[in-house]
Swiss-Prot record:
It holds the Pfam family MoCoBD_2. The lineage of its organism: Eukaryota, Fungi, Dikarya, Ascomycota, Pezizomycotina. Residues 35-121 form the 2Fe-2S ferredoxin-type domain. It comes from Emericella nidulans (strain FGSC A4 / ATCC 38163 / CBS 112.46 / NRRL 194 / M139) (Aspergillus nidulans). One of its GO terms (biological process) is purine nucleobase catabolic process. [2Fe-2S] cluster 1 binds at residues 73, 78, 81, 103. InterPro entries: 2Fe-2S-bd, 2Fe-2S-bd_dom_sf, 2Fe-2S_ferredoxin-like_sf, 2Fe-2S_ferredoxin-type, 2Fe2S_fd_BS, Ald_Oxase/Xan_DH_a/b, Ald_Oxase/Xan_DH_a/b_sf, Ald_Oxase/xanthine_DH-like. PROSITE patterns: 2FE2S_FER_1, 2FE2S_FER_2, FAD_PCMH. This is Xanthine dehydrogenase. Keywords: 2Fe-2S, FAD, Flavoprotein, Iron, Iron-sulfur, Metal-binding, Molybdenum, NAD, Oxidoreductase, Peroxisome. Binds 1 Mo-molybdopterin (Mo-MPT) cofactor per subunit. Binds 2 [2Fe-2S] clusters per subunit. CDD domains: fer2. One of its GO terms (molecular function) is 2 iron, 2 sulfur cluster binding. The gene is hxA. Belongs to the xanthine dehydrogenase family.
Length: 1363
């Protein structure tokens, strides 16, 4: 959306933006101020007059055609929008290149700066070294996140051309990627490094070396992680790196060195923007207009505007006020300007520690530690302490430190300066003691005493990097020479509506002898009184939060004790150390495909679009240039989970300037046209008289701009009559709320087997859902044509044909009038298989009504609210075994939360039942599956499609049986593992069965049992830190379970010049499908890979396509292309015989003049499959992809924090078509699976039924530093695949590795067993997935967690619901 250029605002407009008196006075104050911003963009000067202050930098960039910068979340949490802003740093007076989030940066804030986007540093013809190395290093799959990652690395290199490995490892803490698993990105980035020093992060003033606490079983990380650039090059199949030449970078424009900042004032009816250049000007504004919103980095303000619908009539930008960004060292305190950036504050803290020494510098070490995990680098580059203080967030990481250190806040107004002790600053929730007309000018942070004072800061969150705190704390104590407590501050965030001191605990501690054991116990008891949380406390997690408060103090107490009485018998030294990470590394077996490499097939190579993606030139749906007369759509969504629709009033919305129309069910050709769904047509595009889930579309507002459309949608007034709501599986079971579809598999005689079993064990296993979190949200452009009702649909969909069918339905024409096109997706993972149809249908309805193009790209919160997730599952099981552990029988009821409609839930449940055996033989089995009908968004396909849920239940059963029998779980797996030729419980023979072989290989290659002995020794000597291991096998059936979908078509053209154009039915969504298909065609036709091209996927070139899903697309489309190429080769055979040395150009030329058809339509359908439910007959899958993974983790049992130490993955992918692509799929799937089973927790508001976790702020996919510290991947080799009848004898690899991520979960469970055993608890642990830090902590059985447990009172329920 291009920003509007406004005329100079009139006085009436200004009065609308400010109170009347303030407006008049402000006009008088600012009448001489400038209304023009001047900046440079990619080296070119830009001058803009009277800019709309509501426009973000991202909107401006995309509006002028620089679409390489992407919108991923609109809240600064994913990094897809990262650009670099270069300026003379007001604090250091040096040039600094800051990576920032363009999605939350106001355009008007870049005055006097140089903005650099991904387009500005290189292109496909002349790429930057970063872009080229990332591309050939396989660091880009779907590519939507890639420009942001490129720019984060670019910022690092511009500031430090030879960064350390540690700096590179941490450079991406503000970026997310959903595809790659991060390893290849880090490998490419590390090629720029100069390795020095140990890679461990510093904490609490320590040196940071991993050997300091003797924690590493493998020695210092420095010894294992240092690599030269040459070493890094060997990680890639093609090490032809472009040389990095820092002296050829874009220069900082000379005119900006002498750019003189001028005060700015401009705006419109809605908003006025001021940029003072002196503090005096700022104070004058505040005196006239105390309610003016002060903006430093805009990191919080933009979110308030976007998601909380806050409106600020007047904003004052402080980012360029040098006076507020200075610092000064004094004898006993450091004074910092309150608007200093957090990045600069990190550097200042380093200087302070060096100046004051480690003892007196403890406050600055504490601040620096909190900053290390404070948001991402892009946020820290612009955010400030003043912003933290003014917003008064109860979970701010810095505020507890300021309170605990007795920092003084200096507030200035026009007529006075006020000193406010931080202990008195916070008054209530988001309320402070700051006078309305004052600004936070500076902070005076006292140094600690040279002796006797101890300060530590702590934080626990769901994910280590870029995550808000669950609980944080700053704990300080001052001791006399006799160790009596003379002063104490115990300050916590996340325990109350504001940053709060533990008053009872502080009172108890004061005057006590610190080294007396009774002091610890008494303080813990007092903390229980301070934080007596209720079970239903807002924010939830009552037990966990209480345990963290107690645990932080327990750690602090022993840390201090270790400093003053290192040999005390009361010292629990093992509790002091926190988890640290080494520089991550990994190895791949690059020789795995050597034995069967052909001219093209079997050879490693990058994704063919990788370089376009890295340079920002790859085009996605919303990058398509605006069409003439195009409108933007924004959906009106239900805010109730279950209610009657009483009225929908659009009058106010249609009055908003720029709003054109409203579309709903009345605009469809018939009531029947409103119904959609696959395979059951049980969902409506637009709600009619009732809504059955929050987030259900009611209508769509059309407007000239996205902003106007969003404002219009919010202005639609909907009146409801609420109805009873069912959210969770348990609630659905209790209410018997199920869809009719029921499936079962029965084999053998379970009843008799249970009677004969030595042991019968029963249990319940539960697994949460998972948000797809593709970086590109659902997007669509519907373009009506002038004739015959034709329409062109550009949709971010995995399913062009179904999109075509339903667009035809809602527009009332035949399918031959609709062309559905897809260039590429920014990720899909199943979330765009059916759910993309909803947006396409609504956009098409709107376009048909107004006869104008309609565009819509969902915001992240809208996408999560409407598009569904992986199904949560619940399994109640009973298993019979012999005393030796041989499995005899399994009986299980499996329930899936389908949501408010069925979507693909039936097929998802079917696959879960077929995978509930994993790799184990249950000779007698009866498993049943039901779909729960609830008032949540309809859950849908997600990578694995029910398979991971069934596999998880199998491994949960195996783990619990092993514990019941006190057997080694690794041996129990071997005892019950299928052998070659065995039949599954759905009567399919296991051919080319290699799991036992791979299991043995992984045990040996990972030195599993030797390391397990080391883990046992570690656990024996570490009370509060435990390690665990697991080795998890898998098999995954490849084929659509719906038989008719196992078919594909292709169209291959050979042109006169010998170039080849291929079209097929599959969609490129980052998995490298087009790359593999191009390779197949190039091999078959005997031409170079560069001579073959795939442009797009479209329904007018290949019709009746199956969705790109089920890991079957390479098999299906590959053989269809091969079939077409075979036809062409047969036609060219006579010419090859006549001209054996001719090129394809020569052959095509000759054949054309002989009137030979140089186009061929290929087709393939999977043979010999077709399963009949109920009869348990027929072959369900064409083959099984197999794998084994060994994982090792470390958990902090005091906090629930954890880190993956190592993963060794081996996959059987047959004869790989392209090992680079397959390795990328394996690594990406593993990390996505690790997220599924650990960090990714979806939560719903109990009171409203709306999803709470609807963005990166509170839904945590794994980040760069969540991957295994050692991440090894290999492919099975040196075997024959005698029965594999696929293209190249390759196996599908997209979905199968995802379950391997559960190895981290089961390793955590193993560590928890050790933690519980430490305290004498040996009960069998039934661990719910995901194993979040909360679940890890509350599963421990130590005295601290037991005293922290919060029980629900009668009728009391948890704040959030896990459905």
């Amino acid at each position: 959306m291009a920003p509007g250029v406004l005329l100079q605002p009139s006085q009436s407009e200004l009065e609308a933006a400010s109170p009347p008196k303030a407006a008049a006075s402000l006009l008088q104050l600012t009448e001489e101020w400038d209304d023009t911003i001047r900046f440079y963009l990619n080296g070119t000067k830009v001058i803009l007059d009277s800019v709309d202050p509501e426009i973000t930098l991202l909107e401006y960039l995309r509006g002028i055609g620089l679409t390489g910068t992407k919108l991923g979340c609109a809240e600064g949490g994913c990094g897809a929008c990262t650009v670099v802003v270069s300026q003379i740093n007001p604090t250091t007076k040096k040039l600094y290149h800051a990576s920032i989030n363009a999605c939350i940066a106001p355009l008007v804030a870049v005055d006097g700066k140089h903005v650099i986007t991904v387009e500005g540093i290189g292109n496909v013809k002349n790429p930057h070294a970063i872009q080229q190395r990332l591309a050939i290093g396989n660091g880009s799959q779907c590519g939507f996140c890639t420009p942001g990652i490129v720019m984060s690395l670019y910022a690092l290199l511009r500031n430090d051309p030879k960064p350390s490995e540690h700096a590179v490892e941490e450079a991406f803490d503000g970026n997310l990627c959903r595809c790659t698993g991060y390893r290849p990105i880090l490998d490419a980035a590390q090629s720029f490094t100069s390795p020095i020093g140990c890679g461990k992060a510093r904490a609490n003033g320590g040196s940071g070396c991993c050997m300091e606490e003797q924690k590493g079983t493998n020695g210092c990380c420095k010894g294992s992680s240092e690599e030269t650039t040459e070493d890094v090059k060997h990680k890639f199949a093609s090490p032809d790196f472009i040389e990095y030449k820092p002296d050829t970078e874009l220069i900082f424009p000379p005119s900006l060195w002498k750019h003189e900042l001028r005060p700015l004032a401009f705006g419109n009816k809605r908003k006025k923007w001021y940029r003072p250049v002196t503090v005096q000007q700022l104070l004058e504004i505040k005196s006239i207009h105390p309610d003016a919103k002060l903006i430093g980095g805009s990191t919080e303000t933009q979110i308030e505007i976007k998601f909380k619908q806050m409106r600020y009539g007047a904003s004052v930008y402080l980012g360029d006020l040098a006076e507020l960004r200075q610092f000064a060292f004094h004898d006993n305190y450091l004074e910092i300007g309150a608007n200093i950036s957090l990045t600069d504050l990190e550097s200042v803290c380093d200087q302070a520690i060096e100046r004051y020494g480690s003892a007196r510098g403890q406050p600055f070490a504490a601040i620096k530690k909190q900053l290390r995990y404070f948001a991402g680098r892009q946020i820290r580059n612009v955010a400030s302490p003043a912003g933290n203080l003014a917003t008064a967030s109860p979970i701010s990481d810095l505020n507890p430190v300021f309170v605990a250190t007795n920092t003084t806040l200096v507030a200035r107004s026009l007529d006075k300066e006020t000193e406010i002790p931080m202990t008195q600053f916070f008054r209530g929730y988001r309320s402070t003691a700051l006078p309305p007309d004052a600004i936070i000018s500076s902070l005076r942070i006292p140094t600690a005493s040279e002796k006797g004072e101890y300060l530590r800061a702590y934080k626990q969150s769901k994910r280590k990097d870029d995550d808000i705190a669950i609980v944080n704390a700053a704990l300080r104590v001052s001791l006399s020479s006799s160790n009596d407590v003379t002063s104490v501050s115990l300050v916590f965030g996340g325990m109350a509506p504001l940053t709060v001191s533990a008053r009872n605990a502080e009172a108890f501690l004061t005057g006590k002898k610190f080294t007396d054991p009774a002091t610890l116990e008494g303080t813990m008891g007092a903390l229980e009184q301070d934080f007596n949380l209720k079970f239903g406390v807002p924010g939830g997690m009552a037990t966990y939060r209480k345990s963290l408060a107690l645990g932080f103090f327990y750690r602090f107490y022993h840390d201090v004790l270790s400093q003053i009485e290192a040999r005390s018998s009361d010292l629990d030294n093992s509790v002091v150390a926190e988890i640290e990470r080494a520089i991550s590394t990994g190895e791949k077996d690059n020789e795995a495909s050597a034995a069967y490499q052909q001219r093209v097939l079997g050879r490693a190579g990058p994704h063919l679009s990788a370089l376009k993606q890295a340079t920002g030139e790859a085009q996605y749906t919303d990058d398509i240039p605006a069409q003439k007369n195009e409108l933007y759509g924004c959906m009106v969504l239900s805010t109730k989970a279950h209610a009657k629709l009483l009225s929908v009033n659009t009058e106010a919305a249609l009055e908003i300037p720029g709003v054109i129309d409203y579309v709903d069910h009345k605009d469809l050709p018939s009531p029947r046209a409103n119904w959609w769904g696959a395979p059951n047509c049980d969902e409506v595009f637009f709600a009619v008289d009732k809504v059955t889930t929050a987030g259900q579309p009611i209508g769509m507002i059309l407007a000239n701009t996205a902003k106007a459309a969003e404002e219009g949608a919010r202005a639609v007034k909907v009146e409801y009559e609420e109805l009873p709501v069912i959210l969770s599986i348990e609630e659905a079971i209790e209410a018997q709320s199920f869809f009719e579809r029921f499936r079962y598999i029965k084999n053998g005689d379970p009843e008799s087997a249970f009677r004969d079993a030595d042991h019968v064990f029963e249990g319940v296993s539960r697994m949460g859902g998972q948000e797809h979190f593709y970086l590109e949200t659902q997007a669509c452009v519907a373009i009506p044509k002038a004739e015959d009702g034709e329409m062109e649909i550009w949709s971010s969909t995995q399913n062009p044909t179904e999109t075509q069918s339903y667009v035809a339905q809602v527009t009332g024409v035949a399918a031959n009038k609709i062309v559905s096109r897809v260039k590429r997706l920014g990720g899909g993972f199943g979330g765009k298989e059916t759910r993309s149809v909803q947006l396409a249908g609504i956009c098409a309805t709107a376009a048909a009504k107004v006869r104008r193009p309609v565009r819509c790209m969902l915001n992240r919160d809208e996408d999560i609210a409407t598009s569904g997730q992986r199904h949560p599952f619940y399994c109640k099981w009973k298993v019979g075994v012999t005393r030796e552990g041989k499995l005899l029988a399994l009986d299980a009821d499996v329930y899936a939360n389908g949501g408010h409609t069925q979507d693909l839930s039936g097929a998802v449940v079917e696959r879960s039942l077929s995978h509930i055996d994993n790799v184990y033989r249950f000779p007698n089995i009866y498993v049943r599956g039901r779909i729960c009908k609830t008032n949540t968004v309809s859950n849908t396909a997600f990578r694995g499609f029910g398979g991971p849920q069934g596999l998880f239940f199998a491994e949960s059963i195996i783990s619990e049986v092993a514990d019941h029998l006190d057997l080694q779980v690794e041996q129990l797996r071997i005892l019950n593992m299928y052998e070659p030729g065995d039949m599954t419980h759905f009567n399919q023979e296991l051919k080319d069965w290699h799991v036992p072989l791979m299991y043995d290989q992984v045990l040996q290659e990972s030195e599993y049992f030797e390391r397990r002995k080391a883990v046992e020794e570690y656990n024996r000597t570490h009370k509060w830190s435990k390690r665990g291991m697991a080795i998890i096998p898998t098999k995954f059936g490849i084929s659509f379970t719906a038989l008719f979908l196992n078919q594909a078509g292709a169209l291959v053209h050979i042109y006169h010049d010998g170039s080849v154009l291929v079209a097929h039915g599959g969609v490129e969504m980052g998995q490298g499908l087009h790359t593999k298909m191009t390779m197949i065609a190039a091999e078959a036709l005997g031409v170079p890979l560069s001579d073959v091209f795939i442009s797009e996927t479209a329904t007018n070139t290949v019709a009746n396509t199956s969705s790109t899903a089920a890991s079957a697309s390479s098999d299906l489309n590959g053989y269809a292309i091969y079939n077409a190429c075979t036809q062409l080769n047969e036609r060219l055979k006579p010419y090859r015989e006549k001209m054996p040395n001719a090129t394809l150009k020569d052959l095509a030329h000759a054949a054309y003049f002989d009137r030979v058809n140089l186009s061929a339509q290929g087709y393939y359908r999977t043979p010999d499959i077709g399963y009949t439910w109920g009869e348990n007959k027929g072959q369900m899958f064409f083959y099984f992809t197999q794998g084994v993974t060994a994982a090792e983790v470390e958990i902090d049992t005091l906090t629930g924090d954890w880190t993956p130490l190592r993963a060794d993955i081996k996959m059987d992918v047959g004869r790989t078509i392209n090992p680079s692509i397959d390795y990328g799929q394996i690594e990406g799937a593993y990390i996505q699976g690790q997220g599924l089973f650990t960090t990714e927790e979806s939560l719903w508001h109990r009171t409203t039924g709306q999803i709470f976790t609807k963005g990166p702020g509170n839904y945590k996919i794994p980040g760069f530093r969540d991957i295994p510290q050692i991440f090894n991947v290999s492919l099975l080799k040196d075997v024959e695949w005698e029965n594999l009848r696929t293209i190249q004898r390759s196996r599908g690899v997209g979905e199968p590795p995802l379950f391997m991520g559960s190895a981290a979960f089961f390793a955590i469970r193993d560590a928890l067993k050790a933690a519980r055993k430490e305290w004498g608890v040996t009960d069998v642990l039934s661990l719910v997935s995901p194993a979040t830090p909360e679940r890890i902590r509350v599963s421990c059985a130590d005295p601290i967690i037991e005293r922290a447990r919060v029980k629900a009172e009668e009728g009391e329920k948890s704040f959030f619901v896990a459905i």
